[in-house]
């Protein structure tokens, strides 16, 4: 089992490496807004590249950030940061970035999908690197303003200049990540582990586990309201404990009955067959099969996603959850 021996912090990074360089942040959504403001507040020269003059354009202006059309933002940029959704990046690259960017400009990503699966093939004379914050954009901004930072991953795909890592760490410092710590990785590792986590636990796994547990109780005649509390609603409390204190801390916080039941039945439910299917899911990611399917799905208008979302919205557990929201919120203390 490999483990990194190096975590980069403020002392390993220097903003002077990119001072005076023009940075174009493409996109002004959750991450784009946070990055642009943090980099600006770190004393760097930042513009935002957008495809049209809409709400994001006006929001950037109100935040004191200069918005430009993408092709205008990249033509003079030394560093181009892609912070638009994965499936928009290839089209944006082909139509609005590649034809207009200046020779040798750096290409920066927050997720490795498009580079790893070769949907974007960068010029040979560009440094290509990634800084991937391990938190949503609003948290990246909130922590920065409070003097902290969200941890991040850093990876170098192309190092033509010989200074790609130094520039990547400077960007990481500019958004506040080095205040916490930046862990080195590769585009391959970040992409494959990110997709795996989303599919088998964070979105896919936990969603299906909650659904299966809820439906099992309801099918056996238990009230759906009670089933919802026991299989879905209480999950937040346990996840919060794991987040704050680790798995050991969570186990120490629950009852002895819960500990014994969890340690015995948990392995019965998540057994070797499940682990085998997890490995199969990982192989689909590593082979590129998932990426191929997702690109095709996206091109067809995402029918699987649309139909799946509709099924979830119309499910019994969702209806019960919506009915219980007022009850759940009623007991929360006023802040």
Swiss-Prot record:
Domain KARI N-terminal Rossmann: 5-185
Binding-site positions, Mg(2+) 2: 194, 230, 234
Catalytic reaction list: (2R)-2,3-dihydroxy-3-methylbutanoate + NADP(+) = (2S)-2-acetolactate + NADPH + H(+); (2R,3R)-2,3-dihydroxy-3-methylpentanoate + NADP(+) = (S)-2-ethyl-2-hydroxy-3-oxobutanoate + NADPH + H(+)
Residues involved in Mg(2+) 1 binding: 194, 198
Keywords, comma-separated and alphabetical: Amino-acid biosynthesis, Branched-chain amino acid biosynthesis, Magnesium, Metal-binding, NADP, Oxidoreductase
A Pfam match: KARI_C
Residues annotated as binding substrate: 255
SUPFAM superfamilies for the chain: 6-phosphogluconate dehydrogenase C-terminal domain-like, NAD(P)-binding Rossmann-fold domains
Associated pathway: Amino-acid biosynthesis; L-isoleucine biosynthesis; L-isoleucine from 2-oxobutanoate: step 2/4; Amino-acid biosynthesis; L-valine biosynthesis; L-valine from pyruvate: step 2/4
UniProt GO MF annotations: ketol-acid reductoisomerase activity; magnesium ion binding; NADP binding
Name the record gives this protein: Ketol-acid reductoisomerase (NADP(+))
Organism (species): Saccharolobus islandicus (strain M.14.25 / Kamchatka #1)
Taxonomic lineage: Archaea, Thermoproteota, Thermoprotei, Sulfolobales, Sulfolobaceae
């Amino acid at each position: 089992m490999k483990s990194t021996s190096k975590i980069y912090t403020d002392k390993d990074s220097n903003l002077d490496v990119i001072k005076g360089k023009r940075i174009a942040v493409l996109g002004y959504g959750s991450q784009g807004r946070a990055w642009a403001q943090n980099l600006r507040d770190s004393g760097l020269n930042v513009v935002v590249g957008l495809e049209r003059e809409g709400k994001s354009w006006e929001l950037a202006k109100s935040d004191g950030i200069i918005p430009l059309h993408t092709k205008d933002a990249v033509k003079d940029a030394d560093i181009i940061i892609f912070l638009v959704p994965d499936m928009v990046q290839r089209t944006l690259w082909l139509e609005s970035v590649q034809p207009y960017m200046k020779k040798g400009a750096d290409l920066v990503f927050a997720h490795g999908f498009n580079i790893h699966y070769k949907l974007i093939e960068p010029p040979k004379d560009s440094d290509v690197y990634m800084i991937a914050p391990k938190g949503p954009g609003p948290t990246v901004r909130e922590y920065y303003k409070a003097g902290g930072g969200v941890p991040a991953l850093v990876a170098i795909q192309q190092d033509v200049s010989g200074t790609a890592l130094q520039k990547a760490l400077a960007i990481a410092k500019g958004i506040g990540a080095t205040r916490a710590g930046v862990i080195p990785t590769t585009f391959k590792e970040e992409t494959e582990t990110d997709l795996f986590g989303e599919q088998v636990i964070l979105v896919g796994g936990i969603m299906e586990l909650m659904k299966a547990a809820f439906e099992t109780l309801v099918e056996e005649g238990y009230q759906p309201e009670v089933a919802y509390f026991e299989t879905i609603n209480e999950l937040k409390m346990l996840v919060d404990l794991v987040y704050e204190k680790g798995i050991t801390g969570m186990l120490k916080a629950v009852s002895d009955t819960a500990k014994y039941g969890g340690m015995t039945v948990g392995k019965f439910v998540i057994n070797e067959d499940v682990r085998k299917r997890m490995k199969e899911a990982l192989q689909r990611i590593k082979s590129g099969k998932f990426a191929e399917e997702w690109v095709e799905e996206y091109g067809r208008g995402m029918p699987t996603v649309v139909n799946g979302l509709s099924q979830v919205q119309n499910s019994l557990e969702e209806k019960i959850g919506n009915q219980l929201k007022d009850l759940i919120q009623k007991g929360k203390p006023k802040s």
